[in-house]
Amino acid sequence: MILAKARIQGHTARKRFGQHFLIDSAVIDAIVSAIAPAPQDCLVEIGPGLGALTWPLLERLGGAGRLHAIEMDRDLAAHLQRLGHASLILHAGDALRFDFAQLARAEQARLRIVGNLPYNISSPLLFHLLDEMNEVVDQHFMLQREVAARIAAAPGSAHYGRLSVMLQSRYAVERLFDVPPCAFAPPPAVHSAVLRMAPHASRALPQLDWARFAALVRAAFSQRRKILRHTLSVYQKTPDFDALGFDHGRRAQEVPVGEYLKLAQHIEQNAHPNPKP
């Protein structure tokens, strides 16, 4: 039964690409409604697969917007190209190597990025997109439920970690709904969840060297059981560190995102040479 579902339109899901095709119409409708495409939008879909989200999104665009689809499986890219649509532009290649900023410049528009992401590239892709966030309106992604929980986690929770801090420092994150394995063919071994991620306005973000911020967060979470007095010992040589009022008797997972940002600002303003990320 699973194999039959996986051979939709003559294509067999390929494990090396982490392919699980969305087949539940109610879930598809819920995702498209959450995205709420507007006629003038420039959408980018990562991993369109057989087009479960692609075609409903194109219908909502109504011919006025554009949908760029990035597909690594060349057979699927060719399949979508053959079906043809005036507003659909196919890019056969790896989303991890795709230049989203260049596309935004070419379109003279900020991008709305969507996708049912292969689980094996979700974290690397999210970090790749951090460098492109000035060109992005929002992102709607289907992710492994555990990864979604880590991204949206609150301080002090079991899931709160480096991924939470790095992404929440740059985005407003909203976990929309969960999706069961039966919504896919073949069904994955885990549940999924849909997230909305909207970049914070640049004026609301501190002026930081974000590579140094990444190094700070990585150091903080390098040993979760140790308190920050030990994991961030190199940073405590910063002038006026104690005057900042930062409680380094806590563990990394107890510190809110805002405090990491304030700490990074203080370190940067005092010209401390942070370790390279």
Curated annotation (Swiss-Prot):
> Where does this chain mainly localize?
cytoplasm
From the Swiss-Prot or TrEMBL record, state where the protein is found. Cytoplasm
Keyword set, alphabetical order: Cytoplasm, Methyltransferase, RNA-binding, rRNA processing, S-adenosyl-L-methionine, Transferase
The cellular component terms of Gene Ontology attached to this UniProt record, alphabetical and capped at eight, are: cytosol
| InterPro entries found in the cross-reference section | KsgA/Erm, rRNA_Ade_diMease-like_C, rRNA_Ade_Mease_Trfase_CS, rRNA_Ade_methylase_Trfase_N, rRNA_adenine_dimethylase, SAM-dependent_MTases_sf
- ATP-binding listed as a keyword: no
Q: Kindly list the positions annotated as binding S-adenosyl-L-methionine.
A: H20, L22, G47, E71, D94, N116
Q: What is this protein called?
A: Ribosomal RNA small subunit methyltransferase A
Q: Which organism is it from?
A: Burkholderia sp
Whichever gene encodes this chain, its name is rsmA
